[in-house]
A protein has these predicted regions:
Chain B
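Class I SAM-dependent methyltransferase SAM/SAH-binding core
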Residues: 53, 59-109
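Short alpha-helix
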Residues: 176-190
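A short glycine-rich, Lys/Arg-flanked "PGG" loop and its adjoining helix->strand segment in the class I
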Residues: 133-148
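Conserved Class I S-adenosyl-L-methionine
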Residues: 196-262
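A short SAM/SAH-binding and catalytic strip from SAM-dependent methyltransferases
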Residues: 119-131
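A short acidic, Gly/Pro-enriched loop at the edge of an enzyme's catalytic core
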Residues: 108-119
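Short, glycine-/aromatic-enriched active-site segment of Class I SAM-dependent methyltransferases
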Residues: 20, 154-174
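Conserved alpha-helix/loop element of class I SAM-dependent methyltransferases that forms part
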Residues: 30-48
Length: 493, 262
């Protein structure tokens, strides 16, 4: 008689949260039908089966190969008391410092998007004061020493009445790069605005919302046909030459067929240095879905977006779009050279070992001197014929055919996929590695983007988090960090 | 199909039906085994939604790997009725009958409606076919527009030494293989673009080592003697050593190629 078999391969166990009540629940990770699933059950709200990835090989690559020693904040801001994710942050059990720190300077926005994790809109009038913003910036510096990237966000940060003063405050601190996350409306419409922004060069980058070329898609995501805004904002940014990343929020079945076109468009804009794709995070305002947001129907995972990029931009090979080691299962990236003849991928030419083992943990690798030098060396001429793989030969062939311009750092183009973690796919193993963090308006805490939108934003902390904390009746005695583990080992001998 | 290619196809198919072939090469007949099949499937963008054609599927091992690990639906076709029967039985045993089907067909004359598949694969078989260009055209026309093809096979950059042109060399697909550039040109000529060639010579070193070990084991246990072989394989040791040297010198190797139907 043959033994009974599970309908899946068991891979691992983890801790998740119930997507209804956000209580911690036991979970399994299993492989079935070519996909990675999370199985979990809440005593009150029942069982859930959540798609984590539709590419087992890539998922395993991210989890098992792209691992690096995590970097920590200078000092944690909270203690480990209720358990993850109720102790943010940064708590001593978090396994990554903040690569990108967001400061939301206003709740106000000149759009009211049906999809908005922050729930911003014209009806919300609260702007943070400069004093408060200074406290938040000082928190960033206290945690990171020299923060790699500060992203000014909102709401729509450019509507803050003291927007440029805020940029000055950032500049007065030891911050590597200043990013402004904007829908581009003020840049497009206001004479002189782009020029004033340009005064903050170098080290300033615009994160420009850019979801689609189709009016019906823009109406669904942004309640506004922003095509002219996009065109005019990019004209202005090209004129003043401010480095720009196009940021596309991707909703399943709506604009997931435009990824290749957005990349192509980005490569044709002189100021554009990369494209970031973010599937909609199930958090905040999620309007305009037929009979409401339905995670089984509407959720979109990183591996699906990755494959769609590879299908729609065939110039990229699978080995060109790889996990980012600091948070490998939720960040993927590709580097390419932007030439007049098109994109020439670079990532596949670099030994993954090199990417894993060098540079600080940051999602913008090319800003790290060692990696930057390595990329530049790739297109220097000292490679011997013997050391060339076929990929390298192809690469050099393409360079031969497009020699007129001087190649340099300016030619590097980045494609990034950022899948923020929602309650459905919450995986404790992964949430501890998140590196995009939001500075809490209290200026005391730094909270992962993902958990901030689920438990800490605005009223959530009081309405949702507090009751959950009360349920955790036995306070933990401390973190499960290495330092404590070592101490208990010593004390037992 | 010409009489010669008919003979060749059936000759090769017969050869692959022999138990000795499976004993020597293992479940996956091609170099790299299931590991390379997974690599080829990833490189060809196979997903749970993909409808995949595996041309010259042999015992269906790759079809099962792709159905089980990638969740794809796979149609395998082969010239050998015996291999197909084994493939079906193994799929049934693995509970994959809903995800796999097997069809008797020649690679040079596929019985599928044009544009039926998202991905077409041909592992370690292309250079066995009399007319590679015809086979590539078949692999292309089976695809939907924008579909991908994935090939693994030997390449031969300099002519093979005489010792490798014997039967064993033929079984190992070495003798008639094109060069790496030859594959590129053939794919381009058949109407593919975004052609990518990846060298995977490690698969050959592994396979040669495995065959050598198995020969020793079979001889030592007297599981099989020369008299059991319907075809004279001869002493494999010198051929394998020649093959290793030839690969090390860069004369031949193994590759996977992927391309898009343009």
């Amino acid at each position: 008689m043959t033994a009974k078999q599970r309908p899946y391969q068991y891979y691992d166990s983890t801790i998740s949260i119930c997507s209804t009540c956000l209580q911690r629940v036991d979970a399994k990770i299993v492989f079935q039908d070519g996909c990675v699933w999370m199985l979990k059950r809440c005593p009150q709200h029942g069982a859930e089966r959540v798609l984590m990835a539709d590419d087992i090989a890539y998922y395993k690559l991210a989890r098992e190969t792209f691992i690096k020693t995590p970097e920590q904040v200078i000092a944690p801001n909270t203690s480990a008391r209720y358990g993850c994710p109720y102790d943010c942050g940064i708590c001593p059990d978090h396994e990554q410092h903040g690569c990108t720190l967001l400061i939301e300077v206003t709740d106000n926005c000149n759009l009211r998007c049906p999809t908005c994790y922050a729930g911003s809109g014209p009806e919300r009038q609260t702007h943070r004061s400069l004093e408060q913003i200074e406290r938040m910036l000082d928190r960033a510096v206290a945690n990171e020493g020299e923060p790699s990237i500060i992203q000014i966000s909102g709401g729509e940060p450019t509507v803050h009445p003291q927007f440029f003063e805020i940029l000055e405050l950032v500049r007065q601190r030891p911050v590597g790069h200043l990013l402004v996350n904007t829908n581009g409306i003020r840049i497009a419409n206001e004479a002189g605005f782009a020029e004033r922004l340009a005064e903050f060069k170098p080290g300033l980058e615009i994160y420009l919302q850019f979801d689609s070329f189709r009016p019906e898609v823009l109406k669904a995501l942004r309640a506004s046909d922003l095509r002219n805004t996009h065109t005019r904002a990019l004209e202005r940014l090209n004129e003043v030459d401010i480095h720009t990343t196009l940021v596309a929020t991707i909703r399943r079945g709506l604009n997931d067929d435009e990824l290749g076109e957005i990349i192509d468009y980005g490569t044709q804009q002189p100021c554009v240095r990369g494209v970031t794709f973010q599937p909609v995070q199930a958090a905040g305002r999620l309007e305009g879905y037929e009979s409401g947001y339905n995670s089984a129907r509407d959720r979109l995972t990183l591996t699906e977006i990755r494959r769609k990029i590879l299908e729609q931009s065939p110039v990229l090979a699978p080995e060109d779009l790889i996990p980012v080691p600091c948070h490998p299962d939720h960040l993927a990236m590709a580097y390419a050279l932007k030439l007049e003849s098109g994109l020439v991928p670079l990532t596949g030419l670099v030994d993954p070992e090199f990417l894993i083992n060098s540079g600080r943990a940051t999602i913008t690798y090319e800003k790290e001197p060692a990696i930057r030098e390595h990329f530049l060396n790739l297109f220097s001429t000292h490679h011997s014929v013997d050391s060339q793989t076929d990929a390298m030969s192809d690469f050099l062939d393409k360079l031969d055919r497009a020699p007129p311009q001087q190649l340099g750092y300016e030619n590097i183009f980045r494609i990034l996929i950022v899948e923020f973690i929602d309650a459905q796919g919450f995986d404790l193993r992964s949430i501890r590695k998140t590196c995009v963090h939001i500075i809490h308006p209290d200026g005391k805490r730094v909270i992962p983007f993902d958990t901030y939108n689920l438990l800490y934003r605005d009223g959530l902390e009081k309405q949702v988090l507090e009751p959950l904390r009360k349920r955790e009746f036995t306070p933990l005695t401390g973190p499960i960090s290495l330092a404590r583990y070592g101490k208990s080992e010593n004390s037992s001998t | 199909m010409s009489a010669t290619s008919q003979n060749l196809a059936s000759c090769c198919a017969n050869l692959y039906e022999l138990p000795i072939v499976e004993q020597l090469l293992g479940e996956s007949f091609h170099p790299g085994g299931a590991r390379l099949t997974r690599k080829l499937a990833s490189a060809s963008l196979i997903s749970p939604q993909s409808n995949v054609l595996d041309v010259a599927c042999g015992n269906g091992n790759s079809a099962r790997v792709i159905a089980a690990d990638f969740g794809a639906t796979v149609t395998g076709c082969d010239y050998s009725a015996l291999n197909l029967a084994r493939a079906s039985a193994a799929s049934q045993a693995a509970g994959l009958t809903g995800k796999t089907q097997f069809v008797r067909a020649s690679a040079e004359q596929l019985p599928f409606a044009p544009g039926s598949f998202d991905v077409s694969l041909c592992e370690c078989s292309l250079c066995l076919f009399e007319n590679m260009d015809t086979a590539l055209q078949q692999l292309r026309s089976a695809l939907k527009p924008g579909g991908r093809t994935g090939i693994s096979d030997f390449f031969l950059n300099t002519p093979a030494p005489d010792s490798l042109n014997g039967l064993l060399g033929r079984v190992l697909c070495v003798a008639g293989a094109p060069s790496a550039d030859g594959y590129r040109e053939a794919l381009s000529g058949a109407g593919f673009d975004f052609i990518r060639i990846r060298r995977v010579n490690w698969t050959l070193t592994d396979t040669i080592q495995r065959i050598r070990h198995r020969f020793k084991l079979l001889a030592a246990t007297k599981t099989i003697t020369a008299a059991d072989l319907p075809i004279d394989f001869g002493d494999p040791a010198p051929v394998l050593a020649d093959l290793e040297d030839f690969i090390a010198s860069g004369g031949a190797g193994y590759l996977i190629a992927t391309a898009r139907r343009s």
